[in-house]
Amino acid sequence: MAIKGLEQAVENLSRISKTAVPGAAAMAINRVASSAISQSASQVARETKVRRKLVKERARLKRATVKNPQARIKVNRGDLPVIKLGNARVVLSRRRRRKKGQRSSLKGGGSVLVVGNRRIPGAFIQQLKNGRWHVMQRVAGKNRYPIDVVKIPMAVPLTTAFKQNIERIRRERLPKELGYALQHQLRMVIKR
């Protein structure tokens, strides 16, 4: 029954205005795309324990228009440098200090670098040649350059979250949003 009403509304709108139906479609598509971005960002933030804002700003939305009713979501799936998590500080561990003459894996008397809410043992902060500051760590097994930037892998969580959520949200929300957008366009046309 709802589909018949929707078809009739589309037909009436297309008689009145040429751009009303494509405008409603573009509006619905943009709403669905932006909700897919926000839900996927929330899911990835929970999985990786990174602030949602940092995840969300990696997704870019090219909005749908009347002439081109396709929204395009572009996601930066590169690893996230740990320095972006927040302030970095060195915290002294409260463990008992080693006795004189004993060796310990914890150099510097047991201090640990904490960035945001993550503890990174054996890490240090350094300015690179390009002028950026990064959290670095010694990497075992790398002969030539044995230090590397500490990063959080984001490719797998971002890919899985976006693939799951885009399909699900398109199925669930697009018909509703299309109905709302058509009603909105109808109100706009009637007001004129």
Swiss-Prot record:
GO CC entries: host cell cytoplasm; virus tail
InterPro entries: Phage_lambda_GpZ
Keywords recorded for this protein, A-Z: Host cytoplasm, Late protein, Viral tail protein, Virion
Subcellular location: Virion; Host cytoplasm
Known function: Stabilizes the tail structure and acts as a connector between the end of tail and the portal vertex of the capsid.
Protein family according to the UniProt entry: Belongs to the Lambdalikevirus tail completion protein family.
Protein's UniProt name: Tail completion protein Z
